[in-house]
């Protein structure tokens, strides 16, 4: 049947028109869908980037609060309020705070971003060799200018600043290079510390290099490893159960274990060298190669060991001593004082190994250094970093950093920071002493255009209202209390205007300027100013003759004028595609992804010199900063092109100001105050420059063109198009009539959703293609008129009129070009699809970076809450001391310690612990500051409380029967250990399904289970078992497409994993979880895994 239908249709002479119209319509629908999807993805990517940078800003402030708590410069009773304010902060468009200074501040930040050497010079001049002051300066640059190094280009810029700053100060130190690095008070060493502690690639490298070795030390348990022989002997002899005659044997055991641990650390560090971040590798290598030729022989030796210190003493050893701080191990892992001591001893030995070529080690270390087998690995590692050929990634970094190659690294398109950050940055730059460096002088000159400080929204409200509102007064009272909590002199880390106020006073989004496109020659700037003045003078003339403008050009000018000057009545401003509502839009990167075809008209217009995007009064030198750079050439901000043509905003304050100006009030609107000096700031810019800065770029070009046509016809160049005939049969495909007809047919046929049915065909005479096309269009026209679609009907009549100009051969050529246009449209659709795929990948990358930021923030939150709870349990709330001088919390914890050991029944112990935790939670929440804590902070606080309380009574709770329980655990571990060497996944007693053997021996699950004994609380131990089972479940899913692990699959594999991992004290761990977490595993996933795990252990008992 289908063949018969196809045969009939093949003889239809109208078929070509039907198929062509259908294809054009399909292409139009597909192109519209792709365009809408592309626009949506661009907006989503822009919103995701702002969200990402805001989260990074919050995380940076959280880190600083944690640092101040640790240094005791912040009162713990105000910490939760600060964290709550930071967490509730949302970023707003910066121009709302800074007014007409926005573009200048934007220019300043972009110059600082593009000139890392100038930033290093500035930091070097500001260095006060004070840790607190330097850290505040570094943090401002770190999260405001470089966005915490999230994007690859940001990370490289930070690396360049660190490298150049270290070179400046190392050269100045001469033979004291290593001393400067070890003191860690100079701004270069502080910035390097920030770099290695905050950069995600560095944390990944440290995890790879140290995690296994650190876990081995943790699993050693409560065994002291002392380098000092006297201290080791003292610990041994203090135990009354030990015999002094066994002291040499004990000392040999200590030395043997320390040597084995050190060798294991060095081996893993060497194996992880390939994971060393390229930027860090480049910093050390560039410092060595740059300074080696300019220093004397003694300083060259000092330089070599200084570079070694940068890796070993300033990176590896701190991470070994504090593995949880660097994310090497989880914060839930039990690391007590003994483990901390042992890790410190190992780090000291490794440091001595790295220094032994330069200085003689102390006597107590020589015994260990002589027995270590892998001492050569450090020297080999440094030779690989400094002397051998660079890795490809390091070589690329070197080329980009030296300016020999353009950067193709992904970068951001916004700056996010607080008002305090901007004020601090401006203050420091304005106070920079005079210098002969032209770049720094230009940066200072840009900064001089702005006021000394900007006022916050709270201060602006205070200016507008003569009487303080009760709410505002309460905010200031809270602020005064918080400021008293900072126990240091100088500027507070938090600006007085940003604490305890509404969230709009925190975040600001600055769009990165593209200096390659926007900073042009001063002559071009002056020419644009003259054009603007001419347009103003001729405004009346254009209005008088507007009605006489031809229909081809008038709608463009009128539409732009109406769009620019129309009042805003509601919040539906963004529905107009020609306008952007900056109350909801931060930045839209229109050209983040470049299409390989020719740029659109809009893109070409943006690439022209644009005076409206920069300050008109900027000096020539400032306008030429970064002109030779191309790093931001891809950051063409859509909002930069559109915002200058918008003179209104739908915010309440802007509408109020517009009403005041329109009513000609003599008083200047107070809502426009944007600096600390209020209305007394002298405006150094002329009126024309301010108008030119915010004028619409597109409107200027349109008005200029229109006026030229209307008034200055003599000066116009001869129009070659008008001199040629509209329709030319001799030059058919190049004449304007052919191009117009082709364009109109594509437009009309692309909008037709229904095609006529021509049922009667005349066979009396042969019809030409032109006649058939006219008949086909008549059918479409009739259908359109019947549907009352008069606009489309008018377009169809225009198409029919244009076709009348052509002969039959011309119509056939026109049809051929329509078919050829199909190929071009397919190519454009493919380009849009490729661009959409790139945007989707970028969106995925941003989501990945956000997860990374949230992970770091969660680690910071855990460390911070742990410090707060430890203070709470050790000292309590100082304002609630009892007559004994102790707080109720301290008394309750002491009572728990003294009575817990007398309880024998498991239920009594569990209930006693739960009662204490309930009481401590109630006491904690009675503190006003903890009412501001988030749910995650409270949950972490309860976990920390339980861990802190149980740590002191852990052995009593874990082995209630002491020696009897320990013997059972050792016996089971011994039996499992013997079986472990002979058991394989195909052992007949295990009965593991054959389709699961491809993932054997499940090493990830074994590694997770081996951590069981390193946790303190029952819930943490249960979580460890759940993660082990989850790993097995995920591996089972790899065995087949739709594999879901049932109990029959999970239990045999779990038996094999338990035998191979052979965790310590397995029976006591199960009993401990049953006692103190039994009520929490009644149902759900945890209960399912818990039952399967106990079944696996019971089965092991039967088969061994």
Curated annotation (Swiss-Prot):
GO terms for cellular component: clathrin-coated vesicle; cytosol; endocytic vesicle; membrane. It is a peripheral membrane protein. Residues 156-389 form the Ras-GAP domain. Residues 966-1104 form the VPS9 domain. The keyword Membrane applies. It holds the Pfam family RasGAP. PROSITE patterns: RAS_GTPASE_ACTIV_2, VPS9. It is found in: Membrane; Cytoplasmic vesicle, Clathrin-coated vesicle. One of its GO terms (biological process) is regulation of protein transport. Keywords: Cytoplasmic vesicle, Endocytosis, GTPase activation, Guanine-nucleotide releasing factor, Membrane. InterPro entries: RasGAP_dom, Rho_GTPase_activation_prot, VPS9, Vps9-like, VPS9_dom_sf. One of its GO terms (molecular function) is guanyl-nucleotide exchange factor activity. Its main location: membrane. Interacts with GDP-bound rab-5. Interacts with alpha-adaptin. This is Receptor-mediated endocytosis protein 6.
